[in-house]
């Protein structure tokens, strides 16, 4: 599986570079906790995470602690030695939710901090992911083949608004996807009074599975 992933990743990166070099040049990185985690590609031993406590700088799990005893384990490992495209490390973040038998939780999320200054300067966004589900052989639950991406904005006065509600398709094989936010949609976010920005991946709420995330990057469309 890992060999197949390396081959697929190399083919995808080569394909993108070949067909759209100008488009890639028009984007620059926006710092996020998850992006930094993948850039460093440092291993994380399997750990049972505490809700809303960082397991890496700027990265944490959101867990519904009011309904049942939902939990999650995370780990990270290098896929191979050396660096990936664009100077990035090559690593895999594994997120394994554990669900209560009786009560369905309201949410299980993977969350990351986003550089607010860079977000406010961006004319548009592109959010790149490579991910797949590893579903246990004995799983009997219906697991949606997607995760939902949201941008949560904390505003002055304590107001919080959620945006995007974008479904990222996730298969059982590594799949690359780009979510795009154009200039018009960026204007509608009204970022002037925003004090904090988070990107949130909402995971399926049932089943025996592990979300495998091999790449995460937020890119800003240059105004020029």
Regions found by a protein language model. Give the residues of each.
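Extracellular beta-strand ligand-recognition surfaces/modules
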Residues: 178-224
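Extracellular carbohydrate recognition and processing domains
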Residues: 156-192
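Solvent-exposed strand-loop boundary residues in beta-sheet-rich modules
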Residues: 153-159, 205, 222
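Membrane-lipid interaction segments
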Residues: 76, 105, 109-112
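Extra-cytoplasmic beta-strand recognition segments
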Residues: 112-145
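Activation corresponds to long, low-complexity, non-globular regions
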Residues: 1-72, 222-224
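Short, surface-exposed beta-strand/strand-loop-strand elements in extracellular ectodomains
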Residues: 142-156
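Short carbohydrate-recognition loop motifs
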Residues: 80-107, 171
């Amino acid at each position: 599986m890992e060999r197949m992933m390396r081959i697929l990743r190399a083919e995808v990166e080569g394909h993108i570079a070949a067909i759209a070099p100008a488009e890639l040049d028009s984007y620059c990185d926006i710092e996020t906790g998850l992006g930094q985690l993948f850039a460093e590609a440092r291993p994380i031993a399997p750990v049972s995470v505490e809700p809303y406590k960082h397991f890496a700088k700027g990265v944490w799990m959101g867990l519904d602690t009011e309904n049942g005893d939902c939990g999650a384990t995370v780990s990270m490992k290098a896929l191979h030695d050396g660096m990936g495209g664009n100077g990035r490390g090559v690593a895999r973040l594994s997120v394994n939710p554990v669900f209560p038998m009786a009560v369905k939780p309201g949410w299980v999320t993977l969350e990351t901090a986003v550089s607010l200054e860079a977000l406010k300067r961006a004319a548009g966004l592109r959010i790149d992911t490579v991910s797949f589900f590893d579903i246990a052989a004995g799983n009997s639950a219906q697991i949606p083949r997607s995760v939902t991406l949201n941008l949560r904005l904390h505003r002055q006065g304590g107001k919080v608004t959620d945006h995007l509600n974008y479904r990222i398709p996730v298969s059982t094989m590594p799949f690359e996807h780009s979510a795009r936010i154009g200039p018009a949609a960026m204007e509608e976010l009204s970022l002037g009074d925003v004090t904090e920005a988070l990107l949130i991946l909402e995971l399926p709420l049932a089943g025996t599975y592990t979300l495998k995330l091999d790449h995460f990057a937020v890119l800003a469309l240059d105004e020029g």
